[in-house]
């Protein structure tokens, strides 16, 4: 080893060696994520975002975030028929520390979907695009399987292609009628209760008995122009109020008209 002075050590090491460690969470704020009033659980969690600094507004970074929640958590229900459905909610607006979400899609869990696919039966699937009354364009995926006759000794329960076409046409008609005759809130209630799939299963019994009929997935393809009043109505904050409630220093609620200005005092 060469004998000599270490210039780096004699000058105190590298420049900027001692840096101040800043906790990244000190620059972030927590926001409550709110689900629409069509679900029993309104607060579904919290989300982090960097605090507003200059032109970087925190609400702009929150809008567009998608949250995936199980239907069992949204409805406070331990029924296993609800646990495998996942609803997607998208953040559309921010009020104070509340992130207001709207419906953005639905899906089944992977384990449930794979457990339904079995041998000796026919899989029937229909994909339908329909528009709700309030202007949401949705793509709905429906799935069903042929059921085995209990009195038959046959191992298989395959349907003929003519029967498959009839069942698929019946699925398409029912989904079109249910979606086009309801707004988004009514449609979400139907998806939560699984009423569309039950109607399809009941209607197709004469063609061929079915089982495990589900609305497998729902995608939102197109939305109407954003309206804050409709979003507040979904969250139970609308209703056309003409006055706002103001809390005084003593804690009492005082109703004052919109645009109220306090009188000018002569002396302070």
Swiss-Prot record:
One of its GO terms (cellular component) is cytosolic small ribosomal subunit. It comes from the Eukaryota. Keywords: Cytoplasm, Developmental protein, Differentiation, Oogenesis, Ribonucleoprotein, Ribosomal protein. Pfam families: Ribosomal_S3Ae (PF01015). InterPro entries: Ribosomal_eS1 (IPR001593), Ribosomal_eS1_CS (IPR018281), Ribosomal_eS1_euk (IPR027500). One of its GO terms (biological process) is oogenesis. SMART domains: Ribosomal_S3Ae (SM01397). Its main location: cytoplasm. Residues 1-21 are annotated as: Disordered. One of its GO terms (molecular function) is structural constituent of ribosome. It is found in: Cytoplasm. Component of the small ribosomal subunit. Mature ribosomes consist of a small (40S) and a large (60S) subunit. The 40S subunit contains about 33 different proteins and 1 molecule of RNA (18S). The 60S subunit contains about 49 different proteins and 3 molecules of RNA (28S, 5.8S and 5S). Belongs to the eukaryotic ribosomal protein eS1 family. Essential for oogenesis; required for late follicle cell development. This is Small ribosomal subunit protein eS1. It comes from Drosophila willistoni (Fruit fly). The gene is RpS3A.
